[in-house]
Amino acid sequence: MAKLILVTGLAILLNVQLGSSYQLMCYYTSWAKDRPIEGSFKPGNIDPCLCTHLIYAFAGMQNNEITYTHEQDLRDYEALNGLKDKNTELKTLLAIGGWKFGPAPFSAMVSTPQNRQIFIQSVIRFLRQYNFDGLNLDWQYPGSRGSPPKDKHLFSVLVKEMRKAFEEESVEKDIPRLLLTSTGAGIIDVIKSGYKIPELSQSLDYIQVMTYDLHDPKDGYTGENSPLYKSPYDIGKSADLNVDSIISYWKDHGAASEKLIVGFPAYGHTFILSDPSKTGIGAPTISTGPPGKYTDESGLLAYYEVCTFLNEGATEVWDAPQEVPYAYQGNEWVGYDNVRSFKLKAQWLKDNNLGGAVVWPLDMDDFSGSFCHQRHFPLTSTLKGDLNIHSASCKGPY
């Protein structure tokens, strides 16, 4: 019995010392600080012990060089990277791109070797100047949305050249190499058009897969934002609109499992029902739901706004085939994630030997704990616990 206790104690000690093999990456969006008071979220609100990587969204591009979007971003950079004083194991990445940024600046930049080198060298200078540990390329998307087919190849060329430049800079200056990651699409047709997966997997440190935004009001019927599995009603291409199918596609087409980071949304998509008596998956809809009080975006509610919707009397339903919830009240309907679905997805992630999770975005979790009455950052904290994320040197505020 004494030997068993000793062995168990050593195992626990080793686990604490070695830490988790999983990554927990968290996006911070620069516009979160501009929300009304209770929803305003600044870099100083971030628990430095919560995530392994913090990703600042977004930088811009001018004349093929990376640049900040607003002058306030520079103060944010300092505050975000200052969190590393409290957690020496924390890494910070700067994301460039995003949906609103569009593909055009990327297409122009990758079009010639000279433009690519201008961009790559500007990235190295910029990241070092502002104390970031790496880059997140968020090109949405190579080969889609007006980006020409040749960009599929040129994106791989860019990534390969950037990785080489990062390695050379590291050797030349005898400093840790900058990390290189990319956001990856979650729609199969977009993946096919945009990515040479084996080549990207070889050059990138991680691929953060957008396993969310899989259904929205443009569909004309209700659907989950980020279902783990397909619905019995999913046929044709709809059968691929789930986390399991998307990640399987990336793996089956050449991505290393340990480099795949699964997207976890801290928000839901909202719909207006055509008929309030029809509330299930696939029910007909007429438009996006009204904007949330704090996020102020039609068709979307932050997790903490979903909690308010539930607290005000909405009916919550567990969608068992897809392992995620939805809720409705009157003619309003929302598909989202909660602590239960995050736990199930975290276990699935571990069962599939994947690299970790990425939360989009941290500022839509219930960071204050005052809306959902669970705890601070209930969704992200669930992932931290279930993926065994910890830093022995970090002392957080919660």
From Swiss-Prot:
The keyword Nucleus applies. Disulfide bonds join 26-51, 49-394, 307-372. Induction: Up-regulated in response to IL3 and IL4, during the inflammatory response and upon parasitic infection. Belongs to the glycosyl hydrolase 18 family. Chitinase class II subfamily. The keyword Cell division does not apply. Optimum pH is 4.5-5.0. Lectin that binds saccharides with a free amino group, such as glucosamine or galactosamine. Binding to oligomeric saccharides is much stronger than binding to mono- or disaccharides. Also binds chitin and heparin. Has weak hexosaminidase activity but no chitinase activity. Has chemotactic activity for T-lymphocytes, bone marrow cells and eosinophils. May play a role in inflammation and allergy. Its EC number is 3.2.1.52. One of its GO terms (biological process) is response to nematode. This is Chitinase-like protein 3.
